[in-house]
């Protein structure tokens, strides 16, 4: 029998290996698989492993020139999803050699590049990834991380406060700078470019950078605190993005910003390297994430996108609020918040964490809570997110009836009151409203804010839990 055995064969013969013992160097993936009717789970799980590693639909002559056993992905476990008839979790192990070092782009191209359009599957969702320590070590990660950021800003023992400047489109650069100054003067640590503020006809990036830098130096001089404004460097080309980051550094500002999903991982990693080399903090916005992560049965869970960002690099990332206007289930959100901040995270399925993850001292990322939050949420946010977080109130600052600076004062007073109460041992979950009410006696600005937002609620069930 000369030649090789041509023809199509079942994936599960080669790629379903329930006895496989995973290696410490393997990248492990947990997929939520919904096969087409009539496709057995083992075949669907094996198909995912094959299509995202070495496999193709038929045996090929060149298979004989390589060691499949060394390079193939393996589906090593399958478990049903409780309460879902046609879904199950497929665990796949990928050998480390399949991936380029230090490239989040290549990791995603390999693992999720092709397989999501596969006909034998009705739907597919990547729920979690275990990044082996050997692979983590090929990434620089966040430019600075939580501790270095606190040291640079000289702010300890409390969450940081931010605010997105609104209206997000249409202000001139000078008026935009005015809004920044008022917020920072009132007591915020940071203000933020909206994610879609790049360089539009009504406000070119260079003008905005200049006026925002002026605003933050003025506010710094007045308050004696270090201030920052996230200057959005996101652009149409990598070269233009770097040009903006370089200009920000020349102005001496502390932090720039990037939209990492629309800008892309390659651009983001370049920017993160530049930021570490030049002492800039990097704020990351997750615009477009819901396109990828909102469906329960198809796409990629945000915890995977968050892990990828920690590898690619960013010092802050938006991560939902649990209490505001956007998605976020408490336990699940706290699961990926810990994945961003902590060095070692134990497997915990109740929090959606499928694998134990060791980050081997890669710097941590500050989670940013923003979206429909206001002073009444402060106790809950302080309790849920703890000190290592950035709380961002856009409308919750600028919507204050007396203006931006009093809005900033109200948020700062509310935050300081919550932190003090917590440090005195009071239970924020139980006494939160009372703590805010007490603080209004000392702050007319806070009293006015409490009056405006006392009835606001965003009560809808989270979509990805329905």
UniProtKB/Swiss-Prot annotation:
UniProt cross-references to InterPro entries, sorted A to Z: RuBisCO, RuBisCo_large_chain_AS, RuBisCO_lsu_C, RuBisCO_lsu_C_sf, RuBisCO_lsu_fd_N, RuBisCO_lsu_N_sf, RuBisCO_lsuI
Cellular component GO terms, alphabetical: chloroplast
Residues of the site described as Transition state stabilizer: 325
Enzyme class, spelled out: lyase
PTM info: The disulfide bond which can form in the large chain dimeric partners within the hexadecamer appears to be associated with oxidative stress and protein turnover.
Residues binding Mg(2+), per UniProt: 192, 194-195
Positions annotated as active site in the UniProt record: 166, 285
GO biological process: photorespiration; reductive pentose-phosphate cycle
Family per record: Belongs to the RuBisCO large chain family. Type I subfamily.
Name of the protein in its database record: Ribulose bisphosphate carboxylase large chain
